[in-house]
């Protein structure tokens, strides 16, 4: 797991043999512009170009008083894997963590959808898509609350749950689509059952001649690995943790001297990703995927 701190944003990157996830926790600071920065948690998955965003607000109504953070616990440091293959079909994968509120928090907005949908909301006019939001299901589960959404493919389901620990100060309250969490720690699970990608390791994404970069620039090569998969290279994190045809081709051209070639290499992944998404009718190249 990698942790990059850039207050008020805390970025966490987690990947294993089952899935890759990025989690961004935003907790306003005293000098933050509260008109554009509010407490939120984002989960982004390169598989399916999908994710989750949750916006919280202080029950007191006083902006800037609610602080949230990920805490190290027995389930992760702070992130841990979520894996369940008991339902048949694609395994349900994702991340889990312990989320801490310093005061009573109200979940005001939750979006379970494509990264494009989430990005448009966070950076645009904050408009909610009714076709996405209408599919959300809120339910009470033992010790907490669960939010789920069935994708338009009628197969994939994204699920978010928060459950109390012994360090919370009262019960969770669900009122329609508003959820109130007393101050304390909560187990946070974010998962989905979409087919997963195969990540390229640092050794696989770089050419043999460039392997020394792994020791010379470990953070950069680890980041490149997180964005690279056998069937596509993603454009960035978190807002662009998806396929972008133009960006992928330009990046491949610029990085060609150090990228691996041939079967299973990074250059092949870029070309394969572009070819797979070419419009069969007019030959145009797909600019961006919006699956989730």
Question: Positions of the model-derived regions?
Answer:
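Terminal accessory carbohydrate-recognition/targeting modules of carbohydrate-active enzymes
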Residues: 1-249, 253-265, 276-282
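Extended charged low-complexity segments that act as oligomerization/scaffolding linkers
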Residues: 282-292
């Amino acid at each position: 797991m990698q942790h990059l701190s850039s207050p008020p944003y805390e970025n966490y990157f987690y990947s294993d043999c089952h899935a890759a996830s990025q989690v961004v926790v935003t907790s306003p600071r005293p000098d933050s512009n509260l008109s554009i920065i509010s407490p939120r948690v984002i989960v982004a998955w390169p598989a399916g170009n999908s994710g989750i965003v949750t916006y919280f607000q202080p029950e007191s109504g006083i902006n800037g008083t609610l602080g949230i953070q990920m805490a190290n616990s027995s389930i992760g440091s702070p992130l841990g894997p979520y894996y369940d293959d008991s339902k048949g079909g694609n395994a349900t994968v994702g991340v889990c963590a312990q989320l801490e509120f310093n005061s009573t928090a109200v979940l005001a907005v939750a979006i379970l959808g494509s990264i494009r949908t989430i990005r448009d909301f966070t950076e645009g006019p904050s408009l909610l898509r009714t076709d996405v939001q209408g599919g959300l299901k809120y339910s009470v589960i033992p010790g907490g609350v669960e939010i789920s959404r069935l994708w338009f493919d009628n197969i994939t389901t994204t699920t978010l749950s928060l459950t109390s620990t012994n360090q919370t100060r009262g019960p969770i309250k669900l009122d329609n689509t508003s959820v109130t969490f007393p101050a304390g720690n909560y187990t946070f699970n974010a998962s989905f059952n979409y087919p997963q990608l195969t990540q390229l390791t640092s050794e696989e994404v770089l050419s043999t001649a460039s392997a020394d970069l792994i020791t010379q620039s470990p953070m950069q090569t680890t980041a490149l690995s997180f964005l690279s998969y056998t069937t596509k290279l993603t454009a960035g994190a978190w807002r662009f943790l998806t396929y972008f045809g133009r960006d992928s081709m330009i990046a491949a051209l610029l990085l060609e001297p150090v990228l691996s070639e041939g079967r299973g290499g990074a250059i092949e992944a870029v070309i394969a990703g572009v070819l797979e998404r070419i419009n069969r009718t007019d030959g145009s190249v797909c600019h961006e995927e919006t699956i989730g």
